[in-house]
Amino acid sequence: MNSTKFLCASILALAVSLSLLLTLSIVDQVHAAKYPYKGQLSGQNEVPPVETSATGEAEFTVPANGSMKYRVNITGLSNATAAHIHSGAEGQNGDIVVDLLNTPTSKSKDTAYGMIFRGNFSDSSLKGPMQGKTIDDLAAAMDSGETYVNVHTTEHPDGEVRGQLSNVDKAAAGSTNSTNATVGFSTLTE
């Protein structure tokens, strides 16, 4: 009798544990972005490259509401004069498509190591070759590797750090080593 109770309790505990794991996985997937994009920023990515110790990471997501949410974290500089998404393939300069420091919700703050800025924008914030288009059009350009983030400073008015944007999910799907594909990805939080 006791062994039957123990077996039932063990099965119940296992079922609850599995249910909890599945629930957390589903919740994580529900909260996952429609398109997670990321770019690693450095002076070596500038065209032409610039000497700087500054580096950074830019992250973009498309929540269900049709806007694009972003977070840019930079170390080694705190004096950004401008930050944009530009159109252009790797190694090419292109037109500004979004001004990241002047969106209606943009916030920036200096940190002990650099600066962070974040916010979100909608179709109406798109300019240049994206003017009149949608966030989904911008996401398609990001998917094809045709966009980059550029952060400008007084010392480097054409850009101090730059990073090509890519779809993290597509990169992970194309990777044979899923551990390497997901290392360093962080979720945007306000």
Language-model-detected regions and their locations in the chain:
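N-terminal secretory signal peptides that target proteins for export/translocation
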Residues: 1-6
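Bacterial N-terminal signal peptides
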Residues: 10-25
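Metal-centered catalytic cores of metalloenzymes
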Residues: 22-83, 87-190
